[in-house]
A protein has these predicted regions:
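Active-site neighborhoods of divalent-metal-dependent phosphate/nucleic-acid chemistry enzymes
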Residues: 79-130
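Non-catalytic pre-domain segments flanking phosphatase-related domains
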Residues: 1-12
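PIN/NYN-family metal-dependent endoribonuclease catalytic core
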Residues: 14-15, 28-74, 78-81
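A generic structural signal for short hydrophobic patches within well-formed alpha-helices
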Residues: 20, 50-53, 125-126
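Acidic, PIN/NYN-like endoribonuclease modules and their adjacent C-terminal/linker elements
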Residues: 1, 123-151
Length: 151
């Protein structure tokens, strides 16, 4: 496995950078999203998404990680992009040229490989996830839109 996680009894949801940015900016959005992660569901963040958040917000990666941990009440699992993950990402970018950037391809590849949901507001990523049968969660200010059932 490219991403070993000790506790497999919990559902894992990959969080896209656009969702993280909105969480950092909107406390009401934070509260709505927090309801999704109820103790049996754990947030997972890819390092590439953290770098995107840093680029957009100007916040240090360590600060973003600390804030996310504070929001969720526990340390958020961060996936480092290793060679095997880069290879999976590359295969998705090759399969869908011009349709997604690096972090989106990584989320898509991990969603396919590990059978995890992706939480995103990015319509392009949602379309690609649908093509690959990866379940998505689109957070809205008043709830969630699920593509597929939450596992």
């Amino acid at each position: 496995e490219p991403v070993p996680i000790k506790d497999t009894s919990c559902k894992r949801i990959l969080i896209d950078s656009c969702v993280i940015i909105e969480m950092l900016q909107d406390p009401e959005f934070q509260n709505n999203l927090f309801k999704l992660f109820d103790g049996t569901t754990k947030p997972v963040v890819v390092d590439k998404c953290l770098f995107e958040v840093q680029k957009v917000t100007g916040w240090k990666v360590s600060t973003v990680k600390d804030v996310l941990s504070r929001i969720f009440g526990h340390k958020v699992h961060i996936i480092r992009t290793t060679k095997p993950i880069e290879q999976m990402e590359y295969s998705m970018r090759f399969k869908y040229p011009g349709e997604s950037h690096s972090a989106d391809s990584t989320l898509l590849a991990l969603g396919v490989r590990l059978d995890w949901q992706v939480c995103t507001k990015d319509g392009g990523l949602i379309r690609l996830c649908k093509k690959e049968n990866v379940k998505t969660i689109h957070p809205k200010s008043n709830g969630f839109i699920f593509q597929g059932e939450l596992k």
